[in-house]
């Protein structure tokens, strides 16, 4: 019996349609020059961690449900007296997605989570870093379908960074537009 290998919907779309569209738009000489997604990093900073050291663990559990992968607890690199933060204190969680999980997360982000954001008018097209990476923030993590709204005691925001192999922002913007990222006009 032949096994059928699972391929995420967006990856199949990238291989079949998006690569060719980018190749025609930017007239690349080499197949390897065509930009692709490298990774997606999701970071959750928990400001209340100074008062309650269990908060980053709860945030990490929510992040694991959203990403489908166990996050790493981030710790403070140095002490900051003004914020009551001590060195090596847990202050958040982050996860790096690659491969199939990255495409599946991006599919849920574009088609489910972003439309559920209150007063959403589109992503800022200027949020690129100059090297082809796109960063965005979400104020409430409950926009993801994996989070049960009734069981949430506190809402956290998160940073989502989409890293691409594109050398310029214009090429990365074209790649993400092909993936149907809802950029502001």
Swiss-Prot record:
| GO cellular component terms attached to this protein's record | ribonucleoprotein complex; ribosome
A Pfam family hit? Ribosomal_L5_C
Concerning InterPro entries, the annotation shows:
Ribosomal_uL5 (IPR002132), Ribosomal_uL5_bac-type (IPR020930), Ribosomal_uL5_C (IPR031309), Ribosomal_uL5_CS (IPR020929), Ribosomal_uL5_dom_sf (IPR022803), Ribosomal_uL5_N (IPR031310)
Name the keywords, alphabetized: Ribonucleoprotein, Ribosomal protein, RNA-binding, rRNA-binding, tRNA-binding
Name the GO terms of the biological process aspect: translation
The yes or no answer to whether the keyword Signal is present is no
The UniProt entry, under SUPFAM superfamilies, shows: RL5-like
Family matches, as PROSITE patterns = RIBOSOMAL_L5
Q: List the disulfide bonds.
A: none
Q: Which GO terms describe its molecular function?
A: rRNA binding; structural constituent of ribosome; tRNA binding
HAMAP family given in the database record:
Ribosomal_uL5_B
Oligomeric state and partners? Part of the 50S ribosomal subunit; part of the 5S rRNA/L5/L18/L25 subcomplex. Contacts the 5S rRNA and the P site tRNA. Forms a bridge to the 30S subunit in the 70S ribosome.
> What's this protein's function?
This is one of the proteins that bind and probably mediate the attachment of the 5S RNA into the large ribosomal subunit, where it forms part of the central protuberance. In the 70S ribosome it contacts protein S13 of the 30S subunit (bridge B1b), connecting the 2 subunits; this bridge is implicated in subunit movement. Contacts the P site tRNA; the 5S rRNA and some of its associated proteins might help stabilize positioning of ribosome-bound tRNAs.
**Membership in a protein family:** Belongs to the universal ribosomal protein uL5 family.
Name used for this protein in its record: Large ribosomal subunit protein uL5
């Amino acid at each position: 019996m032949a096994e059928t290998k699972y391929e995420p919907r967006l990856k199949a779309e990238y291989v079949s349609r998006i690569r060719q569209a980018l190749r025609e738009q930017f007239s690349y000489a080499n197949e390897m020059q065509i930009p692709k997604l490298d990774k997606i990093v999701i970071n959750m900073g928990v400001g209340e961690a100074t008062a309650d050291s269990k908060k980053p663990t709860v945030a990490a559990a929510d992040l694991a449900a959203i990403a489908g992968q166990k996050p790493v607890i981030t710790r403070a690199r140095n002490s900051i007296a003004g914020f009551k933060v001590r060195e090596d204190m847990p202050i958040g969680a982050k996860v790096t997605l690659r491969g199939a999980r990255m495409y599946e997360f991006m599919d849920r982000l574009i088609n489910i989570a972003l439309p559920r954001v209150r007063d959403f008018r589109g992503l800022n097209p200027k949020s690129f870093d100059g090297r082809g990476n796109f960063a965005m923030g979400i104020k409430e993590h409950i926009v993801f379908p994996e989070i049960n709204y009734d069981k949430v005691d506190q809402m956290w925001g998160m940073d989502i960074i989409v890293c691409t192999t594109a050398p310029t922002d214009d090429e990365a913007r074209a790649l993400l537009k092909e993936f149907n990222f809802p950029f502001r006009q």
